[in-house]
Structure formats: structure tokens, C-alpha cells
Amino acid sequence: MLMSSVTAHDFNSIYRQKGIITAFKEAGYRTAFFSNQRYNHSFIDFFGKEADICDFIKEDAGDGSYNPSDDELLKLVAAELAENASKQFIVLHTYGSHFNYRERYPADHAFFLPDFPVDAELKYKDNLINAYDNSIRYTDNFL
């Protein structure tokens, strides 16, 4: 999902335009942005922080060891929905299928095998493809 209406042709206007989260806030919605990624000083961070509630769950552990699956975001969604706001807009920033693919889904979601963790080397191409395909299946299930 795009966070603003900026295109490649007018990218510099990103500094002057409001994002979609702000648009929903101005329309009277309670807004939330939940991310399964770390802060990286990007526009995702910039627009996400416009929300009433903003949580980057990988930052919660502090030491970098926390590697939650995207399902962990659903706990935050449930808590936010329990607030019973009459109008809510929730954005989920998932980890999806970023490398290392095998870390993007629980072991019980491994359908294509072998998928054991490997380095990104040509000799492991089949394992990498299997792990990537499993991550796509898991994301599809998540959505």
C-alpha cells in the first residue's frame, strides 16, 4: 500500500504532502500503524509516525534478537480493535518475503521442501526458491 500520492516524477513533493494516515486522521478516524520491521529512517517511518498509535515491534526487544513472524502484528490489531473506536484505520507493515526467506514463516508452514536455511549461493538455488515460495504462501495465509 502506498503511503502517499507522490510519484517518481514529483518525488520531492513528498516533503510537502500529507500521507494517507493523516488523511484518515483528518476525516475523524483513529489511526494505527504497526510494523514488523525496524526503524530505518525511511518514509515508511515518517508516514507511520503520523498515526495516533505507532509500534515497530522489532524495536520492542531492543537487542535485535527479536524476530517475530508477521502474525505477531495481529495481536496489536486485536488490541486496537478492542478500543472500539467508531472509525478506525489500521496499517500493517509486514516483513513479508524479505531475505532470509526461511525466517519469514513458522516451520509448520513449510510446504515446499527442502527449505533449510542456507546462504544466498547458486548451489542452494532450489532451497532458496522453496523457502521463498513458502514465505509467499505464508503471507497469502496471513492476508
Q: What kind of feature is each model-predicted range?
A:
Residues 1-117:
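Active-site-proximal alpha/beta segments of enzymes that process anionic O-linked groups
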Residues 74-79, 115-143:
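A long, amphipathic alpha-helix that forms part
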